[in-house]
């Protein structure tokens, strides 16, 4: 689950993944097969099996890889360059993308990525992962005005049991998955440099098929009011939380839950201001790069519909730590955030409220997962600081320290928000 507006709690339930879009331009791929759906949390739990085969496996990095490949693939289909990505897109997947208009594609933004299903097949010795991606892209037909398209697609990935995961520095780069040669050296899924067929999933995740579930020029429904669900549900605590707390203290004796909660409070307040002021750059130090970029999808969706989502007097009432986890690259901590505030949507042309209430606060709870680099230990800061010189970073220094010039990759120096899940669907 990802943010919509600031906290996604209301608008998300009216989007295509949950209810349906407007009918303009909508279609369902006739060849779309039924997939048994699981909750994202259940998929993540099942994927822990991969760590026994592949110690470098990280769900966080896999989601980054999928997002990057999605952007590359749609950009390539607009320039008739899908063959270049044959190591990562099987013929059926390329054929589906190739059926879309072959016009230049720009500003591809993934607004949501949902893990749908995971299974292993001992007969083929492969893992299979199904994800759904919701996106916005701009097509630029020659001699015509640019057109924005909203889409929902289901991508099916496969990978051999013996394959190994990428390191963080390689997660967004695409080359021969066997020898690292440029993709220009591959033809029909075979690298001409190492003479190896590389599109079988033997070396990396490969897209076996793509189902185009919806595509339209009108975006998701962003008006109306939806009541909260799940706020009164009991908190879902991970059964291994006590042991995970002990292990966290062993890895990082300086970790302090109250300081961590202070970081959550700062992220909450910063996001609220950045969203309502339409200065989303201010939230960059708070979020993973993928999550930060995804929000421009929703900003653009509101803008194109002549709407503005407003949050006022938003405040956290209580925070509960519910889960701690770690892989080779990242540590993750999930909290349940109990909050309240005003949340409404107005038409920009006249200020008329078309969703929510301008004067009625609503209480809600969400599960937030924060991550930081596994290599970063030390006191948690409520404010961002440069990892090189320690200077406090202003919002204008979100990408580069204004004191020493060091590039700032948010999760390398402290906890940042990676995922938001609604209380009625969170299962641990």
Where are these regions (language model features)?
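Surface-exposed, charged secondary-structure patches
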Residues: 101-147, 303-350
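Intrinsically disordered, low-complexity segments
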Residues: 121-123, 133-162, 166-167, 203-243, ...
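Core segments of small alpha/beta cavity-forming domains
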Residues: 27-106, 193, 197, 212, ...
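Long C-terminal interaction/binding lobes of large macromolecular proteins
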Residues: 185, 261, 280-282, 289-293, ...
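Short, non-ligating residues that shape and space the ligands of small metal-coordination modules
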Residues: 185-186, 200-203, 395-396, 410-411
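Alpha-helical transmembrane anchor segments and their immediate juxtamembrane flanks
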Residues: 1-17
